[in-house]
């Protein structure tokens, strides 16, 4: 599990074919790998990847065809900058929100505009996940935990504060860029609770009113 608080920015140094799958090598000079071992997970632009090889300042992870087909990795080339976060520990400060590293969709940046020292960004997502986005809710974009400032149909707005601009790859976003999106897992759990009809419990205590009174709905 991750929090969406980026620890370092690395870059892809190689993408190597391994039969039907691939390996990706990531250079990460500014990420402390001293406590990382083979088999650990590192979120790489929001994608949970398992470390299979390790050096003092780089790691290698496997990439399946499934990962390539469902994430923006399909668009990456050698030199691509990537946001990095090691899996959280029980002692980690929980500064963002719950991030699984399982990408829900690939979206497109449709507008970038400077607003003082911040950057306003509009992103268009596939229509099937727009229902999970809500104003002032959380979303993960290329591994970064962010707050949704506005939603219009399948498009949403982010305002990126200067610190996040400096510490992540977001400063490099351009119109047309493809980005990894992970919606807030709580939205999916709420949907499941509302949709599941258990034969043994026809009198469910969960209602839209209950969810709203407890702060799950705005």
UniProtKB/Swiss-Prot annotation:
Listed EC numbers = 2.5.1.9
- List, alphabetically, the SUPFAM superfamilies matched: Riboflavin synthase domain-like
For this protein, the record's InterPro entries field holds: ATP_synth_asu-like_sf (IPR023366), Lumazine-bd (IPR001783), Lumazine-bd_dom (IPR026017), Riboflavin_synthase-like_b-brl (IPR017938)
The biological pathway it contributes to is:
Cofactor biosynthesis; riboflavin biosynthesis; riboflavin from 2-hydroxy-3-oxobutyl phosphate and 5-amino-6-(D-ribitylamino)uracil: step 2/2
Transferase: present as a keyword of the record?
A: yes
Matching Pfam families: Lum_binding
Q: Which transformation does this protein catalyse, written as a reaction?
A: 2 6,7-dimethyl-8-(1-D-ribityl)lumazine + H(+) = 5-amino-6-(D-ribitylamino)uracil + riboflavin
Q: Where are this protein's Lumazine-binding repeats? A: 1-97, 98-194
Report residues binding 2,4-dihydroxypteridine 2.
48-50, 62-67, 101-103, 136
Q: Where, by residue number, does 2,4-dihydroxypteridine 1 bind?
A: 4-6, 145-147, 159-164
* Gene Ontology molecular function, alphabetical: riboflavin synthase activity
Q: Give me any GO biological process, just one.
A: riboflavin biosynthetic process
Q: Which domain of life is it from?
A: Bacteria
Q: Which class of enzymes does this protein belong to?
A: transferase
Q: Which UniProt keywords are given for this protein, alphabetically ordered? A: Repeat, Riboflavin biosynthesis, Transferase
Q: What Gene3D superfamilies does the record tag this protein with?
A: 2.40.30.20
Among PROSITE patterns, the record links this protein to:
LUMAZINE_BIND (PS51177)
**Subunit:** Homotrimer.
Protein purpose: Catalyzes the dismutation of two molecules of 6,7-dimethyl-8-ribityllumazine, resulting in the formation of riboflavin and 5-amino-6-(D-ribitylamino)uracil.
Please give the name of this protein. Riboflavin synthase
């Amino acid at each position: 599990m991750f929090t969406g608080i980026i620890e370092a920015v690395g870059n892809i140094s190689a993408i190597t074919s391994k039969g039907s799958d691939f390996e990706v090598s990531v250079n990460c000079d500014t990420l402390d790998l001293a406590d990382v071992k083979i088999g650990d997970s590192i979120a790489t632009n929001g994608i949970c990847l398992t470390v299979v090889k390790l050096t003092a300042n780089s790691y290698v992870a496997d990439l399946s065809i499934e990962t390539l087909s469902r994430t923006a990795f399909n668009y990456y080339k050698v030199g691509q900058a990537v946001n990095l976060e090691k899996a959280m520990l029980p002692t980690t400060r929980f500064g963002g929100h719950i991030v699984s590293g399982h990408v829900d969709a690939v979206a497109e940046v449709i507008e970038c505009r400077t607003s003082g020292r911040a950057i306003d960004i509009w992103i268009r997502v596939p229509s099937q996940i727009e229902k999970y986005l809500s104003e002032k809710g959380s979303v993960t974009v290329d591994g970064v935990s962010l707050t949704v400032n506005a939603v219009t149909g399948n498009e949403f707005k982010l305002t990126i504060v200067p610190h996040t601009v400096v510490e992540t790859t977001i400063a490099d976003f351009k119109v047309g860029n493809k980005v990894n999106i992970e919606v807030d897992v709580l939205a999916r759990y709420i949907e499941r609770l509302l949709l599941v009809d258990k034969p043994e419990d026809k009198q469910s205590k969960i209602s839209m009113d209950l969810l709203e009174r407890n702060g799950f709905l705005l």
